[in-house]
Amino acid sequence: MIKNIAIVSLSRGVAGEAFAQHEVEIGLKRLAGYGVNVQFMPNALRGIDYLTTHPEARAADLLQAFRDPEVDMILCAIGGDDTYRLLPYLFDHDKLRKAVTDKIFLGFSDTTVNHMMLHKVGLPTFYGQAFLPDVCELGPAMLPYTERYFAELLRTGTIREVTPSDVWYESRTDFSPSQIGIAPAAHPDDGFQLLQGSPTFSGEILGGCIDTFYDFFDGTRYADMPQLCRKYDLFPTAEDWKGKILLLETSEERMPPEKYRAALTHLKNAGVFRAVNGVLIGKPMDRKCEDVYKQLLVEVIDDPALPVVRNLNIGHAAPRCILPFGVRACVDVAAQKITFA
């Protein structure tokens, strides 16, 4: 059972801003209800401006959390942007590898980059939830499906099985205190959906936000990100992807179809689709671009035998499950479940 949680801000410093303090207070009360001790790392609440200017402070918090023998779980406050700027402060002199110990690491979105960092140094991680978007949900409680997996992770230190949610929720546009106690609008969901290939396949899951992966290869958003990712060999090789299951989900920016095609093409050119045993696709927020994304997946992958399963409750669309990376997963679409060894 998890006893001590360290919260880190590895991307955007939203948790330290006054406009988010009502959310932080909600989240801390909920974590107290689980009986866990919570600490914010020294720089986690220093706000957007400070953390944008000081990536070394973000890196220092992560290293300190790993080095602290009392910390059982490292929970990301939120995603955001530019966590790639931590690369020199974590990989020069092999700092991250030397600091890493066996702890739970949970985050999503821009945190995809941190997942790839930790994969590179051999630490299995957990993808799918974060403090502000999930624990600090403004409604009367955490969303039930989301809470089910968060509670399982706290209680057991792992996830054994993932099944679909019965509902999906419209994305919030107002996070002000006026929304406290108001649940998001819910709609019936349709379960895991097989787009192509075999309904059963297995392998270790690895992946994350496709918007972030696009930035690994294209410097339009961050001119130096592709160069830094190449310098530190951050994107896994085709050999590393061999036999794995690729996870992809889209951000709140609702990636335009032409950019989605380009992102898939980057992955294809990197040899990912030839290497993996299957692909899992998270539900897009508010179901935007669902049909065109389906078409583009089939066109770009161009291999009808490769299993592709869509409509997973993972990523930016609520509710969110948690997927373990680095452990064997068995996907069974007919049974509507993913089980983990």
Go through the PLM ranges and name each one.
Residues 259, 265-268, 278-341:
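ATP/nucleoside-binding phosphotransfer catalytic cores, i.e., glycine-rich phosphate-binding loops
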Residues 205-250, 255-256:
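Oxyanion-binding "anion nests"
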Residues 124-211:
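Conserved anion/nucleotide-ligand pocket segment
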Residues 67-91:
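Long, hydrophobic/aromatic-enriched structural stretches that serve as scaffold segments
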Residues 73-75, 106, 245-249, 280:
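Structural motif
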Residues 21-24, 55-59, 92, 260-266, ...:
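Charged helix-capping and loop-helix junction motifs
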Residues 92-133, 307-308:
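Short, acidic/small-residue loops that bind anionic groups at enzyme active sites
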Residues 1-70:
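ATP/NTP phosphate-donor binding region
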